[in-house]
Amino acid sequence: MLSRTFTLSILPLTISALLLTACQKTEQKTEVAPAASATTNASAVTASAPAAVDMSKETAEYKAWVQTQIDSLLADTQKFVALLEAGKLEEAKALYPKARMYFERSEPIAESFGDLDPRIDNREADLEPNEVWTGFHAIEKILWTQNTTKGTEKLGKQLIADVKELHAKIPTAEVTGDLMVQGSVDLLNEVSTSKITGEEEIFSHTDLYDFKANIEGAEKIFAILKPKIQAKNPALVTELEQKFGAVNQLLAKHQVGQQDYKSYKELTPADTKALAEAVNKLGEPLAQMGIVLQ
């Protein structure tokens, strides 16, 4: 974990408290305090909503978008592994964070398939005793700590097999409005718990790519839900556009060229503090997107 001289104040987010309060106040605008837990599941949200809302158009659009992301994930993973097999170390390192962005944008659906998520994306720090480590981060460690592609052969083949399995399962995913709203919140929690701290890409320090991808994933959900949010709370749309804009402007300061980002080690404590504060300010209005479920 990278050393930081400030304490993050980002709290994990949830949408249940916001929806419960809204249901209790049918004709009164209610100011809701920031949430403090991300443990809410879809059933809790559904139980708090007063009536079912037709989200079929939105869920179909989101599922189709995630499919395009996983299509690209598979294509880039195959290119990445081909580079590993060819011993092209620097080219593999360059493609590694870009390939991962497709997965990071899609996590609300990608992580719903049992142990596929950890097989593809597990960090060394999250391994259980005697658990076999596979996936992107196992390869990352070899590339950046040993500075070689040797030893990645078996891991590369397994990674392609796992990504192919994920690709095949996306059409079977059950996508609901609950999953979309909570998924956007969970993506922000991902940023606040591992990307901001530099723990996600601890060997390559390519955390800003993951950070950007998580924000893009949450912003895509917002874009799809925007017409429904606009109909119920136009001010919330304006606030979310401003808050997403603020985060993206800060990330743009650390962009290199059209597609790359600085090493996370190059960021100062002031840089990471500014990013943390911008993410924190986005958190509560993002959770309020749950109004579309009412």
Residue ranges and their predicted role:
Residues 23-26:
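Bacterial signal peptide processing site
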Residues 1-11:
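Bacterial N-terminal signal peptides that target proteins for export
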